Amino acid sequence: REKPDFKKFLITMGGVDRHNITEMVLEELRNCDLPAEVEVIIVMGVTSPYIESVRRKIKSLPFTAEIKSNVTNMAELMANSDIAIGASGATTWERCCLGLPSIQITVAQNQTVIADYISKAGAALSVTVDQLNQLKSRIIILKQQIKDMAKKSAEVTNGSGLIQVLRYLK
C-alpha cells in the first residue's frame, strides 16, 4: 500500500452474519459524513438471513454500496480495498497478510484474543458490537493512521502460514 487512499471500503462480517451487524455498520457509516465517491463492497453469504434487508438498506445510503456473495476472489477484494471493517475472526489474518488497515468488530467471545493481539500490534482498531456508535471516531483515527496501520498490519504475518503448518505436520 504505497499510497493508501480512503475511497474503497470492504465490509465482511462472516458468511451468515446472524446478528445483522452488517446493517448496523452501514447505518453508522451513514452518519460518518463520508465523501460521495466512497465505494463500499459488502461480502455476505447467500444464506444470510439479513441479505435482503441489507439490499434495501444500501439503496438509501449516500455512497455507493454493493453486495457480493459466493466470492472466490476475497484476496483480490481485500487487495483492492483501502480499509476493511470486519469481524475479528479468521479473516483478520488475511487482512493482515495483505496489509489492509481495518476496524475489527468482536462479534463472538472466541474472537477477543485475536482482537486484543491485533489491536496491541497496531494493525487494526477494535470495537465490540456494543461500541458500534464509536465507529465514526474510529474511522477518523484510521484515516489519520492509514499508512502506518497498513505497515503494522502487514508485519503481523509473513504470509507463509500454510508452509509453516505443513512443516509442523511432517
Where are these regions (language model features)?
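Nucleotide-activated sugar donor-binding and catalytic core shared by glycosyltransferases
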Residues: R1-K170
